[in-house]
């Protein structure tokens, strides 16, 4: 099922993309209030048991101090894929902290989906290796050259980072500020509700989350697709076909991995 942005989200993010230095930032609490009801139900217990007010104060304060904080739409992954529709979870670490140039404008690479970048932004090295693995598994080339993965999100792939914000040019700058506890709780909740799912854990950071997942799910582990580690076992891992074979056996719709972009 393709889920469109709800009216609350649309009201927050209806402005055209702007230069990276001028990116607006909607307060975190306001973005949480705009979440779809299903995700809000999942996240409310997580918010209640973590330092959410302090995290909001930190992120909003950094932005108020004039620091470019990426992405603008922090919870975009949750707006594109409903709880019931999540069939595959691909876990990232923190958002891209760099920028790209589109039509002469500098814009953030991060747009709320792990490993994904806005259309027109150069495909990052890790995503190039993900594409390379998919092409090898399915024996054909991916159409186009975009790194925007919203098509996967609309098919039921939750592209989730464990940290949801970052300062421009400062990798892991928002790590250990409270996001990890919230996304850990989200993963635990997601693993407990509804149907069984596929979890793709690439690299030691993602694999450390294995203990959060209840039994019965398909958990696929491999080295990170970064150029530093992809040749140590990510390339050749077979995860995408394995995921589809398992989903088919569960009588769930499979993912068309050859269509990462939205229709």
From Swiss-Prot:
Q: What is its EC number?
A: 3.2.2.27
Q: What class of enzyme is it?
A: hydrolase
What Pfam families does this protein map onto? UDG
Q: What is its main location?
A: cytoplasm
Entry keyword set = Cytoplasm, DNA damage, DNA repair, Hydrolase
The record's Gene Ontology biological-process terms are: base-excision repair, AP site formation via deaminated base removal
Q: Which reaction does it catalyse?
A: Hydrolyzes single-stranded DNA or mismatched double-stranded DNA and polynucleotides, releasing free uracil
Q: Which family is annotated?
A: Belongs to the uracil-DNA glycosylase (UDG) superfamily. UNG family.
Spell out the protein name for this chain: Uracil-DNA glycosylase
Organism, by scientific name, is: Ralstonia pickettii (strain 12J)
Q: What gene is this protein a product of?
A: ung
């Amino acid at each position: 099922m393709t889920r469109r942005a709800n009216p609350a989200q649309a009201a927050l993010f209806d402005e055209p993309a702007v230069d990276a230095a001028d990116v607006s930032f909607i307060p975190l609490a306001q973005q949480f209030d705009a979440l779809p009801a299903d995700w809000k139900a999942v996240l409310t217990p997580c918010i209640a048991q973590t330092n959410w007010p302090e995290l909001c104060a930190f992120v909003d304060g950094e932005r108020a101090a004039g620091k470019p904080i990426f992405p603008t739409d922090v919870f975009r992954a949750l707006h594109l894929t409903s709880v019931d529709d999540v069939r595959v979870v691909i876990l990232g670490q923190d958002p891209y902290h760099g920028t790209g140039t589109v039509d002469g404008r500098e814009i953030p690479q991060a747009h709320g989906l792990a490993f994904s970048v806005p259309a027109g932004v150069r495909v990052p090295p890790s995503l190039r290796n993900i594409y390379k693995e998919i092409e090898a598994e399915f024996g054909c080339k991916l159409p186009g050259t975009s790194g925007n993965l919203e098509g996967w999100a609309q098919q039921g792939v939750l592209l989730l980072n464990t940290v949801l914000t970052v300062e421009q040019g400062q990798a892991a700058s928002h790590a250990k500020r409270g996001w990890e506890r919230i996304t850990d709780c989200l993963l635990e909740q997601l693993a407990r509700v509804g149907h069984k799912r596929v979890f793709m854990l690439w690299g030691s950071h993602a694999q450390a989350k294995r203990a959060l997942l209840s039994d019965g799910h398909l958990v696929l582990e491999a080295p990170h697709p970064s150029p530093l580690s992809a040749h140590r076992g990510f390339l050749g891992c077979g995860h995408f076909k394995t995921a589809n074979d398992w989903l088919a056996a569960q009588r769930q719709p499979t993912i068309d991995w050859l269509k990462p972009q939205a229709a």
